[in-house]
Amino acid sequence: MSSVSIQIPLPTPPPTQAHNSQTFCAPPLGSLTLPEVFDWHSKNSPNHPLYSYINIDGSIRTITWAESVRAVHRAARRMRTELGLSSDSVPDLTAGKPVVGILAVLDSITYSTLVTGVQYAGFTPFPISPRNSHAAVVHLINKAFVSHIIVEESCRGLLEDAFQSLKSDLTSPSMPTTSVAPVFEDLYVSSDSAQGEASVAFETPAWDSNAIIIHSSGSTAFPKPIAWTHGRAMQLSTVPWYGERDLTGKRMACHAMPMYHTMGYLLLAWAASSGLVLNGFRPQSPATKSTIENVFSASLEAHSDIIFTVPSFVEAWSKNPAYVKTLAELDGVMFGGGPLGKQVGDVLVSANVTLFNLYGSTEAGVLSSTVPADFNIDWEYFRISDIAKVAFVPNEENKLELVVLSSNLNTPSVFNAVYEDVPAYATSDLFEPHPTKPGYWKIFGRTDDQIMHSTGEKTNPGPLEHILNQDPHVRASLMFGRGQFQAGVLVDPTSEYRFDPSDEEKLAEFRNLIWPSVEEMNAYAPQHSRVFKEMILVSSPSKPFTFTAKNSVRRQAVIQEYDDEIKAIYFAVDETGRADIPSPTAWDSAKTLGFIRAVVQKVMKKEVQDGDDFFQHGCDSLQATWIRNTILRSLKDSTDANTQDISNSFIYQHPSVASLASFVSSVAQGQNNINSGLDRAQEMNIMVARYSKDFPPHVPSAPQPSKDTILLTGSTGALGSNILALLIASPSVARIYAFNRKSRSSIPLLDRQKSALLERGLDPSLAASKKVVLVEGDVTKQDLGISTELLSEIRVSITHIIHNAWPVNFNLSLESFEPQVKGLRHLVDLSLSSPHPSPPRVLFTASIGMFNDITRAEPVKEVPIGANVAVSNGYGESKWVGETILAEAAKQTPLRSTSIRVGQLSGGINGAWTTAEWLPSLVRSAIHLKALPDCEGDVSWIPVNVAAAAIVDFCQSDSSIMNLVHPRPATWSSIFSAFASVLNIPLVPYTEWLALLRKSAEDAGDAPDADSLQQNPGLRLLDWYHSAFVHENDSAYQYADTMGFPKFDMTNSLRASGTLADEGLPQLGESDVKLWVDYWKKVGFFPA
């Protein structure tokens, strides 16, 4: 049916919004398009907030309309450039607007800004859900005539698979071009950087031209692209004006809403019309995955008034009394996309939680009254919005189907019916009226039997049942799952295969018998509609299927007949998991790893490397649930572990086989407590709290010594050896206790210390200096593993503690570093037990590895950071914990501490640089590949002897945090030009070199032998070399070095260290490179 034109101007909406705002001006909604409204706000509501999120330090970051519109123009310029157009010229659209697909997992702010930027550039954006199969992506590309696709890295594999299919499809149009999706920092730049930017030339779009293409859920064979014109988008934007509450300035939490979803764009339109503020996760790449816990906590931290989410999250929150109490304090919780269980809703409203039941569709728009003013105890029922003209049409079973009629307030984007001579859209949704409240309606079901899950996803059972019904053992089948997390199927066997399904053995046999057909069905189904073997229910001979005269199953009657069995199978699945994977015979590390590997591979039907993020390999929420349930079943069956205390999100918190195995093994062996399932930032804070209480009092009883006595841990390492040599040479230092763990070998500590000094080009005889007392002990023990006499001697004499001993292992979890954290606390207690007037200063060598999750918008300052920034690997997390414990100790006690964030250390006076690190491995691989990588950018590597001198300088400073990197960074190009000269190897662009390394990895196969790795050790770090590199066009370029390490402010460090402040301190250069290469040749790492 042809479309219906929308008349201009739109009728003036009721004056319900923008009553009391000092920053928001209601825009003219009658004739402007949404992009024009954006520009209008940049001039008339410039300081009104559009987005907000929680900063790293816990503060709220607000993005105003003026700032966002500038970012939109940047996105538009970028888009025009990507399509080969001048950024300041209006594209020629006589042949129609190009359709630009967006296949990306981005934070909501970046995504919505990008969508609007594509519109400003003169093109039609088409957000494509990354949950689609590659076949569905091909279908959408063809149907929407997509000419260009913006792709984000995690979706590249999906797009490549789609392109392979496109190449083999002779009916497909030409292959779309592609570009890389921007990150937040590409679009939102500092005010200084933004000065002088001009707005893009923008041609007012026609009212009836396409503003955006949205696709349906893909519940049928393939999702359908649905175009919204600019006129339609403006109609939808006015929905809040037909509501009952003023939303201007209200903060709506959108953390659970992917912006490629219909509601993502609708919320942006509502914000433009009403001044609603959209709260989301802090922009970062990769984007934060929504979980039950982080959506709830982030929504509250951002002071949200309303939380918009999916029913499955609401159900989970309802089980937590503390959550429910908090939800009751909000304006309300809005849910949509699927049904909420009646018992759940009843529990919440009885606790005074206001529920807003949002109903609508991509085709017809939002149809329920949004954000009603009154608390509705009958939360399942809602009124139809005044914006919509509807009719309730009885069907053959006397149920009422909602039909949406075209009007100038609400014109459906799709028409499939005519009602009383008016074009209309028949929704297929069946409604029941409220028995006593006229005008209130409840959804009963669907005429097309579409199943709405609690996740908001939908399953259309017809095509899937048709596939299964072709199996010779199946007479008929019915899919079920309304209001549930996942789908199941009820199968009626043919007469010769009937059996009593209470016979577990026969049930298992029949499931195996029809499983190939189920797998065929699953291959056709979208991810959320796939059926697991345990979700196959078989009919009982005592309750046969009933059929209509047309020999079709009486769906509703049969589903109702099997209601108890359906409830029971969901209960069983919640309590169990895949029963066909045996539990390990023991829960040690090796056997647990094998078990987890088998579970992940069985559920995902593909092999995933132990260290890989299985969500990046396509694991969806349904598969995550099966992995979780299978693990919990095995733990319950074979251990005494208290699984009730494990977080629902533990799969997301440990998203690789290796990390998940480590977690599960610790739970099974009773090494984990109730906090083990919390998100990693919470784990870090919990560990800080555990070791930041009950500090001993400091009781001074002796005068301060005239000279310093230092307790130095880790003196046999590269940095420790250099520190030791400098302390020995210092006239202000009377004694050094060089503290190290006992060696597994029988080599005496004196010999180990001499060897360590010699290896770094230092005088080995220093180990026997009269200033040095070599101590073997264990800081993880309360008495440091030494005699009472020696401990007392150290306690009464030391003036400083330099804690430099910490294992470097990026594969260990935070829990694995708890002994080291405990050791730091023991050293804090030792300091506080000192009889001196001031406790010995504790200097702790932290790491720049803490800054894994920082938004590189400026150099990192010498101030405390939040746990979220340091969430990465256990090593970086443990360093943050250590730094924060010291800060807490300084707050609660007289302790003075200095946390030194040590950067990348390079070789010292003799060039000694550990061969296992990334740079030596890179250069060794370059020799093998006969090419060195070159690129723009700086490196702030600092020679280990210079870093040691700075740390000794810091002993006399009162600053609590120091950033320790080279104060005079060198360029990557200068360093690698020196390598090229010394090694006689040509330079090639970094990306070209990376391609050579990748090719060598393919040639080496999945399991390269030891000889290959010895000659080409960069194979082990290929992924890191790819992900760490920061291109000069990347937004992070200004505030990161070439390999992605942040740039650092060094105000405190330069003030405290004469070594660093010395203008004569040389940059790294060719002389350093020669020393490194000579050392690597000397130890046999490089060929002579």
UniProtKB/Swiss-Prot annotation:
It is an enzyme of class 1 (oxidoreductase). Residues 1-22 are annotated as: Disordered. Signal peptide: none annotated. One of its GO terms (biological process) is biosynthetic process. Residues 712-951 are annotated as: Reductase (R) domain. SMART domains: PKS_PP (SM00823). It holds the Pfam family AMP-binding. PROSITE patterns: CARRIER. It comes from the Eukaryota. NADP(+) binds at T716, G717, A718, L719, N804, A805, W806, Y875, K879. The modification O-(pantetheine 4'-phosphoryl)serine is found at S621. Residues 38-451 are annotated as: Adenylation (A) domain. AMP binds at H261, N357, L358, T362, I443, F444, G445, R446. GO terms for molecular function: ATP binding; oxidoreductase activity; phosphopantetheine binding. Keywords: ATP-binding, NADP, Nucleotide-binding, Oxidoreductase, Phosphopantetheine, Phosphoprotein. Its EC number is 1.2.1.-. Residues 586-668 form the Carrier domain. Belongs to the adenylate-forming reductase family. Adenylate-forming reductase, a natural product biosynthesis enzyme that resembles non-ribosomal peptide synthetases, yet serves to modify one substrate, rather than to condense two or more building blocks. The A-domain preferentially accepts phenylpyruvic acid and benzoic acid as substrate. The natural product of the enzyme is not yet known. This is Adenylate-forming reductase Nps10.
